[in-house]
Swiss-Prot record:
Covalently lipidated residues, kind S-diacylglycerol cysteine: 23
GO cellular component annotations of the record: plasma membrane
Transmembrane segments annotated in the record for this chain: none
Chief localization: membrane
Species the sequence originates in: Staphylococcus aureus (strain USA300)
Xref: InterPro entries: Csa, Csa_sf
Keywords: Cell membrane, Lipoprotein, Membrane, Palmitate, Signal
Location(s), subcellular: Cell membrane
Secretion signal, residue range per the UniProt entry: 1-22
Keyword Membrane assigned: yes
Protein name: Uncharacterized lipoprotein SAUSA300_0413
Family: Belongs to the staphylococcal tandem lipoprotein family.
Amino acid sequence: MGYLKRLVLYIVIMVMSVFIIGCDKSSDTAEKSKEDSKETQIKKSFAKTLDMYSIKNLEELYDKEGYRDGEFEKGDKGMWTIYTDFAKSNKPGELSNEGMVLYLDRNTRTAKGYYFVRTFYRKDKLPDRKNYKVEMKNNKIILLDKVEDKKLKQKIENFKFFSQYANLKELKNYSNGDVSINENVPSYDVKYKMSNKDENVKQLRSRYNIPTDKSPVLKMHIDGNLKGSSVGDRKLEIDFSKRENSHLSVIDSLDYQPAKTNKDDE
């Protein structure tokens, strides 16, 4: 009788051991799968800022804090840098882009930046660059430099950043993206095909001269730590380009960094 009890106990222990080991392996596999999903990590990294879109009143950023790391000094509330530009190839070997960058200092609750117009040439010619200083008060862009061109003046004063009208909360539903990784930098990229029915695409077509019916590609790029960093680069691009050698896209970024003196080095 004692032998049978020991045998039953041994069998129970063996079954439980197999069950526990199986659960551990399943857990490890699930965890590994989760860790290996760089596409998901990239989307989650972007979601920290994109979930705030659309930011109709940019002054709300004065009361929002981003990711803080050791680069911030004690007491520094940080600075948001918001950027949007429209780039296009006018002809072979020439690229123009036009847009705005604005620095919102949470310490002083002031926002300054500039509107830029640039043309780049492939050979034998330096780029043309024009910067027009601006500031923002009461969620309104104020032009500080004198601009004779009335059309350009109006364009600057009425400028809206992509983040002010975009809605990318459905980003989590995008899947099967084309992912590329360079661990040495590190840098991470993922691309998704978009539909012309997408409201963000419709908004861009209504605001910019986009002479193509081609459905765009959403490109997400990160330089630096996926979990968050005040150092590195993070940008979103909606690319309408028809072919490899042409360029037609809208680039957007919203970054949080230690407050610093603005520099027109864009």
